């Protein structure tokens, strides 16, 4: 199924194009996916979830996770925060800080977990900036074998 026009747009922000990421580096793939999933642009996106659907098209996700994101429909319309951002024609810039947990499973040749604090700061085209939104993200990455590309299999946020 082709993406709607709004999801084919390139949002403003700091998401990296998929071909600029080292797919054999779990950190780089996780960082790239999280940055894309939190790069919103209210001039082309209808809701924050559109960024996750865009990420599903990059080739950075397992097919099962990409399919889940493409078919998921949020249960509610965007709220007051999104409406405020939209009134300023805002886009987000994303910063990530590793927040490794001692209880995190050790990497294996085919599975890695990463944890980041994600901060998305909305910037309006009218020079308005709002308080950043912060979340803790847990990313599970898998690959077929050593030396092959890492794929994000799951992102959990709190």
Where are the regions that the model predicts?
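Juxtamembrane and targeting peptides
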Residues: 1-44
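Structured, amphipathic secondary-structure segments that form assembly/contact surfaces
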Residues: 46-158
């Amino acid at each position: 199924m082709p993406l709607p026009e709004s999801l084919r747009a390139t949002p403003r922000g700091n998401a990296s194009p998929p071909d600029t990421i080292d797919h054999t580096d779990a950190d780089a793939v996780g960082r790239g996916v999280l940055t894309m999933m939190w790069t919103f642009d209210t001039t082309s996106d209808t809701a924050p979830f559109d960024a996750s659907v865009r990420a599903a098209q990059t080739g950075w996700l397992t097919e099962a996770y990409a399919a889940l994101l493409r078919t998921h429909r949020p249960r509610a319309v965007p709220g007051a925060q999104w409406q405020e951002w939209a009134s300023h024609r805002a886009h987000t810039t994303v910063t990530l800080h590793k927040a490794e947990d001692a209880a995190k499973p050790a990497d294996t040749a085919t599975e890695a977990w990463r944890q980041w604090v994600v901060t998305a700061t909305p910037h309006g085209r009218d020079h308005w900036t709002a308080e950043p939104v912060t979340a803790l993200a847990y990313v599970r990455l898998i690959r077929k074998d050593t030396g092959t590309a890492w794929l994000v299999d799951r992102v959990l946020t709190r």
